[in-house]
Amino acid sequence: DGYAPIFAYIGTEGFLLDAELREGKQHSQKHTPEFLCELLHYGHKMTDKPLLVRLDSGNDSADNYGILLEDGSWFIVKRNPRTESKEEWAKHIKEWCKNPQTPREGKIVYIGTTWKDVTYTVEKNGQKEQKTIRMRIVYEMIERTIDKYGQILLMPEIELNMWWTNLGWSDADIIASYHAHGECEQYHSEIKTDMDVERLPSGKFKTNALVLDYPCIQHSQS
């Protein structure tokens, strides 16, 4: 199944903060809480400024929010709707959003905020305690009745994206900041191609994990 390494970058220049080699079959959230604690520790050693953590929908987990909230860090995490009905969300969003935008004929964009309770578990002095917090969800829903080529659609096409956050920024700034972290794909590419680790050399997982460490160190020094 190959490998699925996880990388964490800090700042705007692509400095690699932490990395971990994982088996391709491993779910993206497995062992992520431990990885998150580690990278927060490294981040606070590098700077005394507040940290903003951006995560993909594969890491939409109350465990992660608990760690980030207890740490005092900010976050933007792509929300995973799982089994929730897109149609039900669309119905509510049309009721909530007071200023939908129409960038062109047949395309309506709804942007706004709603709130939802999230319960997470913290462990103190060997005792587990549950905490519930009301968390912000920023949504962006695009409804298309005419596609970009002018073709009228038989049924409206709904595109829905949502993000968890504890920031007080505007909805538009939250969405823009999340999309900006797509630049990390460029850093992934540099490590894989420029440093020639597209294919790891060994049949042994631990050996490949060690091999990956070297280009990661070099990447942050270059």
Annotate the PLM regions.
Residues 77-187, 193:
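An anionic, glycine-rich sequence signature occurring as long contiguous blocks
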Residues 53-61, 81-84, 206:
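Acidic, metal-coordinating catalytic cores used for nucleic-acid/nucleotide bond scission
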